[in-house]
From Swiss-Prot:
Subcellular localization(s) per the UniProt record: Secreted, Extracellular space, Extracellular matrix; Secreted
SMART domains membership: CT, IB, TSP1, VWC
TSP type-1 domain segment(s): 198-243
Chain segments carrying region Heparin-binding: 247-349
Recorded GO MF terms: heparin binding; insulin-like growth factor binding; integrin binding
Domain VWFC: 101-167
Signal peptide segment: 1-26
Species annotation: Homo sapiens
Name the UniProt record assigns to this protein: CCN family member 2
Xref: Gene3D superfamilies: Thrombospondin type-1 (TSP1) repeat (2.20.100.10)
Cystine connections: 29-54, 33-56, 35-57, 43-60, 68-82, 74-95, 256-293, 273-307, 284-323, 287-325, 292-329
Gene: CCN2
Length: 349
């Protein structure tokens, strides 16, 4: 091949090299483009396949409430953007919907602020691209008692909401103090100073952590603010570490470890940043008999993270006080149960 004929090839190669090695915009895009050799990832249904924030590789877009960075963008087809908070915090954000973004639910488009009943069990509202639902059925709790040692909810013919029934014990040797029903997390009601004649203060329960192990996100919606405007709030959460083998800590003869003891204080990690303080945190354990262990009482505290470049960011985080192990586990086929939606404060029971 002659030098003249190689001219276009050489130019194309130089252009391609420049595109692949260009520094991308943002803190996490300073290196050259390096994409995995395997084919583009297969995204779950409803999740867009987009170029990362550096314009290099195809990735599954982050969804509402998930953590995002320059390289991990939010789903643009759902009107989401990465909200980084203050200008100084430009590393990690949370995917947030633009004001007034509509919702797509069950193949139907709902306007922001529009309410609808998804089923006989749930009343839902679209808010800036997110659907929040309140249960229409009673969420009361019945714990084991001498006259009803094995309570459980059952679906009765002709009725929408499940009702409590008492089963006779199948095996008398299995009776123990374990809780048989999921109990609502303790939450704080509206600030008395925010109750005004022209504002009905409403706050949803914190949703369950988005991950069963490792760092996740928990969200809620409230209008408990000076402008009485609905806003989404988020906090970090960790139900249990992923690397811990908690089943090894279950005592002989037992089937659960409700709140395993942590041998030493730990530091939390978030996208390469480490908490500035150590924490003797509590985590929820596991069971070997099909029960779930979930947070029962929690509190929210600020945690400061320091990044390798010296930047410090502050994030609210859930801290567990107590856990409960129960059979009322969220169903994989029930989108609302899996998110632990609860009724809003101020609603009629």
């Amino acid at each position: 091949m002659t030098a003249a004929s190689m001219g276009p090839v050489r130019v194309a190669f130089v252009v391609l090299l420049a595109l692949c090695s260009r520094p991308a915009v943002g803190q996490n895009c300073s290196g050259p483009c390096r994409c995995p050799d395997e084919p583009a990832p297969r995204c779950p249904a409803g999740v867009s396949l987009v170029l990362d924030g550096c314009g290099c590789c195809r990735v599954c877009a982050k969804q509402l409430g998930e953590l995002c960075t320059e390289r991990d963008p939010c789903d643009p087809h759902k009107g989401l953007f990465c909200h980084f908070g203050s200008p100084a915090n430009r590393k990690i954000g949370v995917c947030t919907a633009k004001d007034g973004a509509p919702c797509i639910f069950g193949g139907t488009v709902y306007r922001s602020g529009e309410s609808f009943q998804s089923s006989c069990k749930y009343q839902c509202t679209c808010l800036d691209g997110a659907v929040g639902c309140m249960p229409l059925c009673s969420m009361d709790v019945r714990l084991p008692s001498p006259d009803c040692p094995f309570p459980r909810r059952v679906k009765l013919p002709g009725k929408c909401c499940e009702e409590w029934v008492c089963d006779e014990p199948k095996d008398q040797t299995v009776v123990g103090p374990a809780l048989a029903a999921y109990r609502l997390e303790d939450t704080f009601g509206p600030d008395p100073t925010m109750i005004r004649a022209n504002c009905l203060v409403q706050t949803t329960e914190w949703s369950a952590c988005s991950k069963t192990c490792g760092m996740g996100i928990s969200t809620r919606v409230t209008n408990d603010n000076a402008s009485c405007r609905l806003e989404k709030q988020s906090r970090l959460c960790m139900v249990r570490p992923c690397e811990a083998d908690l089943e090894e800590n279950i005592k002989k003869g037992k089937k659960c470890i409700r709140t395993p003891k942590i041998s030493k204080p730990i530091k939390f990690e978030l996208s390469g940043c480490t908490s500035m303080k150590t924490y003797r945190a509590k985590f929820c354990g596991v069971c070997t008999d099909g029960r779930c262990c979930t947070p029962h009482r929690t509190t929210t505290l600020p945690v400061e993270f320091k990044c390798p470049d010296g930047e410090v960011m502050k994030k609210n985080m859930m801290f567990i006080k107590t856990c409960a192990c129960h059979y009322n586990c969220p169903g994989d086929n029930d989108i609302f149960e899996s998110l632990y939606y609860r009724k809003m404060y101020g609603d009629m029971a």
